[in-house]
Amino acid sequence: MSKLIYLDNAATTKTAPEVLEAMLPYFTEQYGNPSAIYSFASHNKDVVAEQRERIANALGAKSNEIYFTAGGSESDNWALKATTEAYQNKGKHIITTKIEHHAILHTAAYLEERGFEVTYLDVDEYGKVNPADVEAAIRPDTILISVMYANNEIGTIEPIKEIGEIAHKHGILFHTDAVQAFGQVPINVDECHIDMLSASGHKLNGPKGIGFLYIRKGVKIRSFVHGGAQERKRRAGTENVPGIVGIGTATKRAIATMEERTAKEREMRDYLIKRVMEEIPYTKLNGHPTDRLPNNANFCFRFIEGESMLIRLDMAGICGSSGSACTSGSLDPSHVLLAIGLPHEIAHGSLRLTLNEEITKEDIDYVVDQLKTIVSDLRGMSPLYEDFAKKQNK
């Protein structure tokens, strides 16, 4: 395979050269423990504080509201488990949606086993949550609302500001999983009344194994990892200084390049969508047509199975996915696609292609040409398509 076109940037991204360069000294040269008192280590303490400030500035937050974690899944777990524990005397009801990442859904299920009640809101055909449904679900014992900023599979951007205003009006904590959105769209936690926000380094050309949880000052939240006094005694463990430098540098890069970078991604994404929808029949675009992440395209191709399509694409040097990378081993159709009303047999034929700023028009042309051949070949072997074609010809 000589050609490689990477279109799975929702799963992970390539670490940017400037990010890697910034990280390297903290592995072999400036490797001191930030908690030590000698100057060799205290330099690293200052560096960690500098990255915290960078991230806070990107969100319109304060630096003492940023807590470093091992990634988005940990941040989601911390937000739900530690706040529900802290506020359970006030109530034991949580509101979320049916299209959340499994880091939220599985944590919600865990909390249900421990006596909490969870309302899972429906979404519309585009994957949008209706803020009115959020407000209607609120009960006197509701303590937390968690709605993702943008969906990791279909790219739909949720009405976060409106939901935040509702939560704020009712005095309920509001958490958003912004793993896909951070670095792709502007976010201001004050404007959106966000109390907690999860993000991850490897989704914005940073390293894996590092993320953060924004926690608004005044929010009661229990310690998630017990031990030392790191992260203001809320998450014990020696700080991952190279990773923190990586996510801080990646954040700086993402904010500085956002306008130009996402404009190019959006242009290529729209070109991809136009060609696929015009040239491959019996295809559906999943997600909102306009309120979606600039690099996301998600399709369903009738009469074929997504895994077979991915294998053929891989043989052609194209990396895509049929849903979240966290559930790639599952044979079940995407819970997100089922939530937007697609039947199982159509949801099985899904393909998510997520771009980066390096993707060119020539790359898209190659992908679409390969996709046309692959879909045609797979439909030619499909009994469902054969039956459909016979009925169409009658």
Region locations from a protein language model:
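Pyridoxal 5′-phosphate
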Residues: 1-394
